[in-house]
C-alpha cells in the first residue's frame, strides 16, 4: 500500500507548537514548519548561517546519514540537496528568539560540563546538552512517537515541509516562490 502524505492545517500547527515546547525536537519541528527545511538542512544549520544583524538565515549545509562500509555514519556537506535548495530566508522574530536562547544554553552547558562537553560541533546550532550534534534520524524517529504521546494526527517529519508549502500557497505565495 502506497503511503499517503498528510499535512497539518494552521490550527494543527498551532497545537503542535504549544505541545512541542521544551521537547528535544522543538527546534527541528519549528524550522521544518516555519521554513520548510528538510531534516538534513535543520541538522546542518551552523551559527555562521544566521545573520542576526540583517535578520537573515542561509541554508547551505546539510548532514545526512549514509552507509559507509556497512556502517551507518553521518556525513556533513557544505551543499544542499539541489542548487535551488541553497537559499536565504528572512529570520522571523520567533526563530530569532529561539536561536538566541539556544546560543545562551549552549554557552551555559559548555561552562557547566567543562571538559566533558563535546567541542567537535561548536559551529552547529542543533546540538544536545553535551554538545553532540543531533542526528538526522532522531527527528524522523522521535517525531511520530511525540505525536502519538500527545494524541495528535500522525504525519511524517517531512510532512511539516509540505504543511509549510501549503500554508504559504494558501496565503498567496506563488508556487515559484515556494519552490
Task: Describe these PLM feature segments.
Residues 38, 66-67, 134:
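Flexible loop/turn segments at secondary-structure boundaries
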Residues 14-25, 35, 89, 105-115, ...:
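Short, basic (Lys/Arg/His-rich) helix/loop patches that form interaction surfaces
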Residues 11-15, 45-108, 114-115:
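Conserved tyrosine-mediated DNA breakage-rejoining catalytic core shared by Y-recombinases
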Residues 30, 97, 141, 145:
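Surface-exposed charge patches
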Residues 4-5, 47, 60, 72, ...:
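Generic secondary-structure boundary/loop-capping signal
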Residues 41, 56, 177:
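Residues in the helix-turn-helix
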Residues 1-45, 52-53, 84-86, 94, ...:
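Basic, Lys/Arg- and aromatic-enriched nucleic-acid-binding interface segment
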Residues 1, 77-81, 126:
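Short clusters of hydrophobic/aromatic residues that line enzyme substrate/ligand-binding pockets
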Amino acid at each position: 500500500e502506497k503511503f499517503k502524505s498528510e499535512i497539518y492545517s494552521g490550527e494543527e500547527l498551532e497545537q503542535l507548537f504549544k505541545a512541542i515546547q521544551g521537547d528535544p525536537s522543538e527546534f527541528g519541528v519549528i524550522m521544518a514548519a516555519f521554513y520548510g527545511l528538510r531534516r538534513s538542512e535543520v541538522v546542518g544549520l551552523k551559527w555562521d548561517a544566521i545573520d542576526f544583524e540583517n535578520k537573515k538565515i542561509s541554508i547551505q549545509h546539510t548532514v545526512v546519514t549514509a552507509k559507509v562500509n556497512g556502517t551507518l555514519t553521518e556525513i556533513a556537506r557544505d551543499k544542499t540537496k539541489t542548487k535551488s535548495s541553497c537559499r536565504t530566508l528572512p529570520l522571523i522574530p520567533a526563530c530569532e528568539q529561539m536561536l538566541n536562547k539556544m546560543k545562551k544554553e549552549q554557552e551555559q552547558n559548555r561552562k557547566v560540563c567543562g571538559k566533558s562537553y563535546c567541542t567537535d560541533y561548536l559551529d552547529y546550532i542543533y546540538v544536545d546538552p553535551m554538545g553532540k550534534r543531533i542526528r538526522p534520524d532522531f527527528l524522523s524517529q522521535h517525531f511520530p512517537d511525540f505525536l502519538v504521546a500527545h494524541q495528535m494526527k500522525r504525519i511524517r517529519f517531512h510532512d511539516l515541509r509540505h504543511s509549510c508549502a501549503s500554508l504559504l500557497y494558501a496565503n498567496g505565495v506563488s508556487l515559484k516562490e515556494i519552490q
